[in-house]
Amino acid sequence: DNTAKEKDSPANLSLRTCAAGDNAEQPLDPSRNTFDNAYYIALQRQAGVLFSDQSLFTSAR
């Protein structure tokens, strides 16, 4: 049955999973609506969420 195979194709699974497309928000910081220092503490512990943030924090420049 080709219908079942097409339904579970990688392209169709991607469309269902990523329905919002490029504009989908990812919950990288669950406390983003409140100001806290958890972001900076994580960087100090070498546990930054994004590699770019951690690199900027540890850069000597």
Curated annotation (Swiss-Prot):
GO biological process, one term: response to oxidative stress
Location of region: Disordered: 1-32
Cofactor note: Binds 2 calcium ions per subunit. Binds 1 heme b (iron(II)-protoporphyrin IX) group per subunit.
Annotated catalysed reactions: 2 a phenolic donor + H2O2 = 2 a phenolic radical donor + 2 H2O
Residues that hold Ca(2+) according to the record: D29, S31, D36
GO molecular function, one term: metal ion binding
Protein's cellular compartments: Secreted
Cofactors, names only: Ca(2+); heme b
InterPro entries membership: Haem_peroxidase, Haem_peroxidase_sf
More info: On the 2D-gel the determined pI of this protein is: 6.5, its MW is: 33 kDa.
Function: Removal of H(2)O(2), oxidation of toxic reductants, biosynthesis and degradation of lignin, suberization, auxin catabolism, response to environmental stresses such as wounding, pathogen attack and oxidative stress. These functions might be dependent on each isozyme/isoform in each plant tissue.
Family: Belongs to the peroxidase family. Classical plant (class III) peroxidase subfamily.
UniProt protein name: Peroxidase 1
Organism: Vitis rotundifolia (Muscadine grape)
